[in-house]
Amino acid sequence: MSDKLIIFDTTLRDGEQSPGASMTREEKIRIARQLERLKVDVIEAGFAASSNGDFEAIRSIAQVVKDSTICSLARANDKDIARAAEALKPANSFRIHTFIATSALHMEKKLRMTPDEVYQQARLAVRFARQFTDDIEFSPEDGSRSDMDFLCRVLEGVIAEGATTINLPDTVGYAVPEGYAELIRSVRERIPNSDKAIWSVHCHNDLGMAVANSLAAVKMAGARQIECTINGLGERAGNTSLEEVVMAVKTRRDYFDLDIGVDTTQIVPASKLVSQITGFVVQPNKAVVGANAFAHASGIHQDGVLKARDTYEIMRAEDVGWSANKIVLGKLSGRNAFKQRLQELGIELESETEVNAAFTRFKELADQKAEIFDEDIVAIVSNEAQHDANEHFRFISLSQRSETGERPHARVVFSMDGQEQSGEGEGNGPVDATLHAIESRVSSGAEMVLYSVNAITGGTEAQGEVTVRLSKAGRIVNGVGTDPDIVAASAKAYLAALNKLHDKAVQKINPQI
């Protein structure tokens, strides 16, 4: 009988630590719901003690997600753990993930604690967490650089206190597959009560080996949980890619002999959603979810695939959620047909007000382009989801004037705290003029660090999706806007980013696990 491999998704916690990938509470809820449809086992929804925003996001996710275990990170102290437990209280099933550094460098320089003090604090933290749940994960931060004897002593102690999952992270992405697997195997063999816990891996991709390291630990060292993110999202070079480890284990079941509960048909929808919300574009040749993952340009390959797909395809595109663009609705389609298509796409809107707003935007788009695709509907919902009661800026309209040999001029009308504003500006091009027009009324002082345009579907009528990344006072935020008019999409994206900058969120604690 095969073992179960647990998929622990940390897109909303570790993935969000990518510069510019910060998400609003509503965006996190949308991703959490998609992760639930994906049937991941555990969703690490955030770090409750790091900010009030994280606390509220975790609590909201715990209220709406019912089929996945919801997890919060917590430092090894009573205050953090109690805060995590409070945020997780509404969940059907929840886990507390606590951690403390165990390397000599971290203990001396960061914690300013002796090894004995760290050992006692780790044990007491797990003991305290047991008051709230039996599902407790422990991570020794910088464990791969810790003294082996001390690391084993700490892990044996926390298992004795009731830790049910032990996670050994490759914090800085330095490990290689054989060495990482050997570390975990050695630790498990040296700890007499290692069989009382599930062993987990959490790898970073600095050397491009996060997936290989994770799979080596599973195959060679008995790890039975992989911590990963959608699209490999994460700071620096990212984390272990969920789609890659899942499809490796699924496709090579003959080698791994493990069961996995993920609904793989939801992988591509999850990838697209995370990319759209964060603005981190998926590279075309990315395994599983890249646009070219199932494309064959070679004539020999094309001929082989046409005759028998398994000649060059080791998995089917539809098995991971890829499908051809499909015309689903048009300008004559009614509200019920629109709601039905939302359900078929797995999109859940919380209220009739949200449905009405999305339907209104759909009808506006249908007047502009004849054919409405699934990707258009997803973009509509994503765009509407950015609007909330606390929204500071909102796009209303745009007019432009541009003639060859003259500097373009733009006039942008938008609301600021409910009051209509009108700004005018000139620039080197229509987009530059439009953003100058907005800044003429806002004076944000932000620096643009990224501007990118992507066509949502094919054809000249396609909606443009614009991503804008702004930096100010050490904060980096991301905004996305969609519209058949690229310049209007740019204005929407810029205002969306300004909304995030306007949110006076306190500085979050971002642990390196």
From Swiss-Prot:
Q: List the disulfide bonds.
A: none
- Name the Enzyme Commission number(s) assigned to this protein: 2.3.3.13
Where can this protein be found?
Cytoplasm
The record's catalysed reaction(s) read: 3-methyl-2-oxobutanoate + acetyl-CoA + H2O = (2S)-2-isopropylmalate + CoA + H(+)
Q: In which pathway does it act?
A: Amino-acid biosynthesis; L-leucine biosynthesis; L-leucine from 3-methyl-2-oxobutanoate: step 1/4
Instruction: List keywords of the entry alphabetically.
Output: Amino-acid biosynthesis, Branched-chain amino acid biosynthesis, Cytoplasm, Leucine biosynthesis, Manganese, Metal-binding, Transferase
Q: Which GO terms describe its biological process?
A: L-leucine biosynthetic process
- SMART domains the UniProt entry points to: LeuA_dimer
Could you tell me which residue ranges the Pyruvate carboxyltransferase domain spans?
5-268
Give the span(s) annotated as Regulatory domain.
Answer: 394-513
Positions bound to Mn(2+): D14, H202, H204, N239
Q: Which domain of life is it from?
A: Bacteria
Task: Kindly list the GO molecular function terms attached to this UniProt entry.
Answer: 2-isopropylmalate synthase activity; acetyl-CoA C-acetyltransferase activity; manganese ion binding
Record flagged with keyword Cell inner membrane: no
The cross-references to InterPro entries, in alphabetical order and at most eight, read:
2-IPM_HCS-like, 2-isopropylmalate_synth_dimer, AIPM/Hcit_synth_CS, Aldolase_TIM, LeuA/HCS_post-cat, LeuA_allosteric_dom_sf, LeuA_bact_synth, PYR_CT
Q: Which GO terms describe its cellular component?
A: cytosol
Cofactors that this protein relies on: Mn(2+)
Looking up Pfam families in the UniProt record yields: HCS_D2, HMGL-like, LeuA_dimer
Briefly, what is this protein's role? Catalyzes the condensation of the acetyl group of acetyl-CoA with 3-methyl-2-oxobutanoate (2-ketoisovalerate) to form 3-carboxy-3-hydroxy-4-methylpentanoate (2-isopropylmalate).
**Record note on quaternary structure:** Homodimer.
- UniProt cross-references to HAMAP family, sorted A to Z: LeuA_type1
Protein family? Belongs to the alpha-IPM synthase/homocitrate synthase family. LeuA type 1 subfamily.
Q: Sorted alphabetically, which NCBIfam families does this protein's record hold? A: leuA_bact, PRK00915.1-3, PRK00915.1-4
Protein name as catalogued: 2-isopropylmalate synthase
Native species of this protein?
Answer: Cupriavidus necator (strain ATCC 17699 / DSM 428 / KCTC 22496 / NCIMB 10442 / H16 / Stanier 337) (Ralstonia eutropha)
Q: What is the lineage of its organism?
A: Bacteria, Pseudomonadati, Pseudomonadota, Betaproteobacteria, Burkholderiales
